[in-house]
Amino acid sequence: MSSITTQKPNITVCGSGSGGLAVAADLAMAGCRVNLYEIPAFSSNLEPIREAGGITLSGLPYYGKTGMARLNLVTADPAAALAGSELVFVNVPAMAVGPFLTEMAAHFEPDQVIVVTTGYWAAFRFRELLTETGAFDRYIFTEMALMPYLSGKAGPAAVEIGNWKRALYLSAWPATGNQKALAAVQKVYPQTRLCRNVLELNFRPGNPGVHVQIALPKAEFFFERARQFRFYGEVSRCASKLTDAHDVERMAVAAAFACETDTWPDDCRTIYELEGSNLYEQHGGPADRHAQKWNHIEEIERLLVEDICYSFIPMEQLASVAGHSTPVTTAMTDLSAVLSGYDYRSEGLTLAQMGLDGLTVNEIIDYADTGRYR
């Protein structure tokens, strides 16, 4: 439980899924003026919130208050949603970030700090739109490694927070905006820490997650029989071994790009205060809130697409630039495609799509730092 110690900033929260409702409700209960925005295609999701007069918040929010969270504005109008806000949190899956930025970018206001809480190389993927609309001189664009909460919808206008992150990691693109971004976000989440650049941020554990590593050892269950289940309650010792092996590859590629990062177990000790030396020991017990959360197969299928298409595949390609190989990551990608029937590689994020094709390691680092090609 915490409190805002500086002047309460005005907030815009984007996305009406569980992540967006969790951020909107908790910060509104903390005293922020909160606008909730949804793109027009999904504006019907806002009607229950308007009818209820806000969002019912339960569980374990960061600011410790539960009940009815009253919002300043609930809208599908991007200009109205963004007006007067210091911070803009975009809380949607990787594949949904594009539609939100396309609707909003022209309406970003001077000095606003835009935070995509799911990372997944958002800055590089949308670099042209960001450059055209003022990411270098008008507003600050940032990525986080993870959403601030473990949450789930408890109804069309209700959200339950199962846990909150004791550490959040952030970087701006270009990295010259890091200090201003950090100062703004720490007004509401003082546990936020800075990564050197968006390269370092995207090499952190979290996003990528461990959904592939958990699913593969129990492939028959997840790909043939599972419909509703406690996903983290299915963590096996084999999943731990895959996680450790992936960590070795991920951390080696990160080091080649002058980035520091943690293992998954070390990160879980930091952000969730979980004890244990590996994935199984941390998530395999009844005390773990992740293991208590119910999931649907459709949610896990989406998470596999995110982790593989937006993390595993670009990491393979960055490894190649640095002269490294990623045999475990490659094997998990290809085996997941065979067992799920989903062609991840046809949708995987490429260096060309990220604007990094043909660049050297040092040129990629420089691009992350400055936003400029040499």
Language model regions located:
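Rossmann-like NAD(P)(H) cofactor-binding subdomain of soluble oxidoreductases
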Residues: 94-157
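Conserved beta-strand segments of alpha/beta enzyme cores
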Residues: 33, 72-73, 140, 193, ...
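NAD(P)-dependent Rossmann-like dehydrogenase/reductase catalytic/cofactor-binding core
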Residues: 240-374
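Active-site-lining helix/loop region of Rossmann-like oxidoreductase modules
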Residues: 166-267
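Rossmann-like NAD(P)-binding element
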Residues: 64-108, 112
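NAD(P)+-binding Rossmann beta1-loop-alpha1 motif at the extreme N-terminus of oxidoreductases
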Residues: 2-61
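Predominantly flavin-linked oxidoreductase catalytic cores and closely associated redox partners
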Residues: 129-194
